[in-house]
Amino acid sequence: MRSLAILGSTGSIGLSTLDVVRQHPEKFKIAGLAEGHDVALLAEQIKEFLPAAVSVRDADSVKKLQTLLGSHKPEIFHGLEGAAAIASAEGVDMVVSAIVGAAGLLPTVSAIKAGKHIALANKETLVVAGKLVSDLVKKHNVHLLPVDSEHSAIFQSLAGHRAEDVERIILTASGGPFRNTSAEELKNVTLEQALKHPQWTMGAKITIDSATMMNKGLEVIEAHWLFSMPAEKIGVVVHPQSIIHSMVEYIDGCVIAQLGSPDMRAPIAYALSWPERSESGIHKLDLPKIGTLTFEEPDMERFPALRLAFEALKAGLTYPAVLNAANEIAVAAFLDRKIGFTDIAATVEKTMQAHEAYDPIELDEYLQADRWAREMAKKFIA
């Protein structure tokens, strides 16, 4: 039986993970849960899964949780340090890293240092500090298993093949809700329109990132670190049906792809069960019913966030950390209706242009770039 700690248990990935766990009580047990926004839902999760320890956002949330709990009272931590304690606790075999944004970096690093295998949904961990995290994974001999559907697809399509036989990897993108929207119309996009993704049900931040195509940009950087692939060997193709989750092209011209219904429970179940497979509960594909699969080139003029991500990856140093931090601030401002849709990428670009990059070594040097970019982005927004 595999003992799990879930960071971000009340979010979209956390809920899907618990649904997979619920289907396989003989395979998985919950040792720890961490969340930041929904204490009431966490209380219900604690009553069902009986974890030994949990973490909440702050001290006030600790008090609120204590009043909601019944007879089962786990050890309660709070803050990022609390999430790190959950992730590195004795008895945990695997950590599902699903905290949104750069906030997931510290707990994930703590888990790796404690020798825990990682099911990674928090792509920002590799975007912000890819080299540091990759080095730690090797040093502590842990598995870093992708939960993102695209990276899970690449991981599965690479299985059994030699790295030197890979020509390139191809990430698919749905194109988001504005795939056919003109550049002029994008300036007037509303928050409500941006939150309506055509294929996936996700949290607000990643839904906006999908609409700007920044999510695909972050996934390009994540793929670079997960698969040791240079930017020149990472392609993106728009695939509106979201049935092919990604592909690997080999030097002989053959392409291997992974297909499935657009449901995060499939890549989650694969990461939790690897190297085996488990029933995920998703709808099985009916290819005749789907009928047609289509593909398009991404438009980096209308969606400059994707271009900025490729530029950050190629430039290296602290640019990816700055890209991510500025984007988090800009998306939050858009969600608060303080800036327009096209201002998101514009804010990121201005912040990157203002940055004097350096070569980070220690974790705090990565976090320093993150903090700088957040403050600079706020100034541009103000």
UniProtKB/Swiss-Prot annotation:
Annotated EC: 1.1.1.267
Source superkingdom: Bacteria
GO terms, biological process: isopentenyl diphosphate biosynthetic process, methylerythritol 4-phosphate pathway involved in terpenoid biosynthetic process
UniProt binding sites for Mn(2+): 148, 150, 219
The protein's annotated pathway: Isoprenoid biosynthesis; isopentenyl diphosphate biosynthesis via DXP pathway; isopentenyl diphosphate from 1-deoxy-D-xylulose 5-phosphate: step 1/6
A Pfam family the protein falls into: DXP_reductoisom
Cofactors: Mg(2+); Mn(2+)
Disulfide bonds: none
Annotated keywords: Isoprene biosynthesis, Manganese, Metal-binding, NADP, Oxidoreductase
Gene Ontology MF: a single term: 1-deoxy-D-xylulose-5-phosphate reductoisomerase activity
Binding-site list for NADPH: 10-13, 36, 122, 124, 203
Catalyzed reaction equations: 2-C-methyl-D-erythritol 4-phosphate + NADP(+) = 1-deoxy-D-xylulose 5-phosphate + NADPH + H(+)
Record: residues binding 1-deoxy-D-xylulose 5-phosphate: 123, 149-150, 174, 197, 210, 215-216, 219
Sequence similarity: Belongs to the DXR family.
Its biological purpose: Catalyzes the NADPH-dependent rearrangement and reduction of 1-deoxy-D-xylulose-5-phosphate (DXP) to 2-C-methyl-D-erythritol 4-phosphate (MEP).
Protein's UniProt name: 1-deoxy-D-xylulose 5-phosphate reductoisomerase
The organism of origin for this protein: Pelodictyon phaeoclathratiforme (strain DSM 5477 / BU-1)
Phylogenetic lineage: Bacteria, Pseudomonadati, Chlorobiota, Chlorobiia, Chlorobiales
